[in-house]
Amino acid sequence: YDMQPRFSPDGKRLLFTSDRGGSDNLWTLLLDGSDPRPVSADKEHVINTGDWSPDGDYVVGRKRLTDQSSIGTVELWLYHRMGGNGVQVTKKSEIPDANDPTFSPDGRWIYFAARDRRYQYNRNVYEGIWQIRGYDRKTGNFRPLTDGYGGSARPRVAPDGKQIAFIRRDRSHTLLMTHDLATGREHVVMDGLDHDMQENFAWTGTYSGYAWMPDGKSLVISYGGKIHRVEAANGTAHDIPFTVHVEQAVTQALRFPQNIAPENVRIRMLSWPQVSPDGSTLLFSTLGRLYKQPWPKGSPVVLANQGPRSYSPAFSVDGKHIAYVSWSDVNAGEVWVMNAGGGNGRRVTSSPGQYANPAFSKDGKKVTFLRGSGATERGRDLDEELWLDLMWAPVSGGEPQYVVTLGNRGAARRMPRLSWTPDGTRIFYFEDKGSGDDERTVLASIRPDGTDRQEHFKIKHGEEIMVSPDGRWAAFTRDFQGYLTALPVLGRDPVELSGESGPLPAYRFAQEGADWITWTADGKAITWSEGPIVHRVTLADIQNSWDKEKDEAGQKTDPAFKAKTPEEKKKEPPTVHPDTTEVRLLVPRAHPTGVVAFRGARIITEKGDEVISQGTIVVQDDKILAIGPEGSVTIPAGARVIDAAGKTIMPGMVDVHAHLHYNSLDIIPEAISPYYANLAYGVTTVHDPSASNYTAFSQSEMVSAGVTEGPRVFSTGYILYGAESPGRAEIQSLDDAKRHIRRMKRLGAFTVKSYMQPRRDQRQWVLAAARDESIMVVPEGGGNLEMNMSMILDGHTGIEHALPVTPIYKDVVTLFAKSHTGYTPTLLVAYGGLSGEHWFYQHDDVWKNEKLLRFVPRGWLDARSRRRAVMATDDDWHHMDVAAGAKKVMEAGGHVQLGAHGQLQGLGAHWELWGLTQGGMTPAEALRAATIMGAEYIGLDKWIGSLEAGKLADFVVLDANPLEDIHNSNTVRYVVKNGEVWNGDNMDRIWPSPRTRPLFPWESQGQMLEPLNMMGH
């Protein structure tokens, strides 16, 4: 993808940005297109927006630095035309974001636009986000040049060096202006440019590139879909007509049909898997139950008498007992011990709470565990614990003892897991210390009385760390890979490890996921899981492979406590030979039995433009048996008939970008309020393109199996993250990409989210690997139009999030429409300007919504809605312009689908739907985006998205017609999902048998603020 051309001072070559080397870098070529040469050749960073020095020897460009945030920061760097690594001009520590560099005609100054701090959403552009600065190449000093309201950006110096052209926001308009360098006087050249990128990430500049004509009397600039020459003195514009005939090769977008209605559900998300000390039994938790099966082969069976939900099982060292924790939304949880064969458990703890990760001492007399701060008692969710107390208790009974308080690692991370030293005098655990780039996962130990805390080692991006029973070794996970390392005994500052290189040896034994690492009781083997696959490898096997590696390197050593050479090895490590079993747990897919019919309603089928003015739908079990005009459909005898006269029926909404925020700390509640909120508002299918692997896939299986109620839940799981943070997906080759795709597929994903992998070749590797595994790729759009265009060319399933540039013209619209790549504009967080959700908060007293308050904690809703974070005039809302672009794509034959981004559960999907019409879509077009197009996008249209005989029974009964007024989508009377019928007002089930909605944890235990009577307020 080539862009941003600039003539060299002698007019013989073009400087441009190209990803032809795999990543955006600066290149030059002759005017006839020959002799392409790289100026920068950075393999780690994106470099673009170059400008020549007047002597033609140097080029200045912007280098994006990705850190713990994928947005990152930007520095300016200077490159010689012959190459080299470049010379730094600005530092991120001094200027967090530098952009739009350009030289003065004498070469002394580099002028650029600077943002005073890192990117922040919904900043007030009228206060001036960007201002122009100058860098003096003689003195090394910086000086500010502008301080204007509306910002100042995209500077271009006139040929005589006396004035600088720039762009500025004035109310809802973008102006072209000039700044006199001698007097500071500023002059408006013209009004009417396209919307600038000052409020966006500005990946390739704050406005399209433009230039002065050589005589300095006019400028060439683009707006309105055309190129113009604008006279600097008076703003008179002259069109520069051009025609381009384009023949563009586009890779077929990835899209694979899915079977979401099998007879049985394959359970893939095993948690806490471990093999009994005698090697005969595999123990694990899934679906909120404890299971065991013979190792290595056999069939799983449920251990009996465990209570409502059971998690976190652990064998005693002798294998005779199992410790585990329970959870009930009403009564909270406890720690229990039971015989390994099953039966009634004996409670170890004496106070209800959220417990996790019990571990027996070697003598079996004590058990240590974690206890939460009581989040649900305060009206919070399970993942919102303020802290976790490490405690222990006698197995025989007695008061639990407090040891130390640990931090909450967050719902995307594993809760600390615990173990004892052989003599029972210390407890090992891990926790995170530091923040930002200094964050490390630390292995520590402490005495049971809370004294003598020691730190043993630390690691960047560490996930789990488990110490061997003899205390000599530790197994840990980092970036989804498993390692073994020697455990030092130093009594001083902890050693920092770094994967396979560093001060201590570390051997990578698992490359495609290493969840729930556990040592066998004798310390001779390690177990871990990859979804339904459980591995066990002996320490001897690892050491033999380690020795083999040393032999091949010509440095045979005893691996214990001997450091490796510091060089990073690019070759694959020798293969260990784990024992492996694939747990094949199949449970029946839940669905009701019987027949229910809705009669007399207007039916929007989404089968083309079909609307049945007065029709009947008959549902048998979980599928539509018949549908058609009233009188043409026979209702079977004995069916439950619901009178829907005067109502409107439409397919259930499909939210393809639904962040459910259903996170937990490994312990999953019985009733999940975001699920009920979405169902209550008619969202019957959700697809979350960024979520905790464990939580998302576990709960998806729970819903399918009928253990938990909710919409159909699908997810990418955790993103394939390109930033430098825990959980990143490092992709430096096609093989790396294949490992990540296989890892996610094993967990149950049929989509993955490629998230801000900075280089195009990295994104292409993900696509190639996904195509081989029949996986769809829904990438983070990132507010980068040029990257989005290359994503379309390369065959991504869709673009998640808005194209930040508005308006979009025929070139972009045509490429989108003809590529079959889907567009999810997420208007509530529309990139490039004000987020759409604030428009709805501004125009709706959301805190008074009594229905919403049944599913959302009032305190949370008050905090979001009672004091508006943003107030703006109606002509200043960017999401409407984004919606207008989506309308163009749909009109041209493209696919647009609804994604509400989880900004407000349930009601937010309707806001997103209504936002589509604010850009010009008709109600019928918006409803298609919310139903059948969303289903088609992720390969579900065989089963859902339209109302046809044989499809799954997912639909909504409305009191009013949304084709007449789109706001009538929020008049939900009944919700039907998978054949079950609920009251849309309170989510009490109506059919096949009445059932009152259960209380949520924050209702049943917490100090919930009751919805107030808002009359008169």
Kindly label every feature range from the protein language model.
Residues 1-4, 9, 15-27, 36-47, ...:
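A flexible loop/linker signature enriched in serine peptidases of the S9 family
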Residues 9-10, 54-55, 105-106, 159-160, ...:
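Residue-level detector of Asp-centered blade-edge/turn motifs that repeat once per structural unit
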Residues 586, 604-616, 629-631, 907, ...:
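Acidic, glycine-enriched loop/beta-strand segments at the rims
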Residues 609-650:
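Histidine-rich, glycine-flanked metal-binding segment
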Residues 647-707, 724-726, 735, 761, ...:
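Metal-associated gating/positioning segment near the N- to mid-region
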Residues 674-694, 710-721, 745-757, 767, ...:
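Divalent metal-dependent hydrolysis catalytic cores, especially in the metallo-beta-lactamase
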Residues 739-758, 802-919, 985, 994-998, ...:
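Active-site neighborhoods of metal-dependent hydrolases
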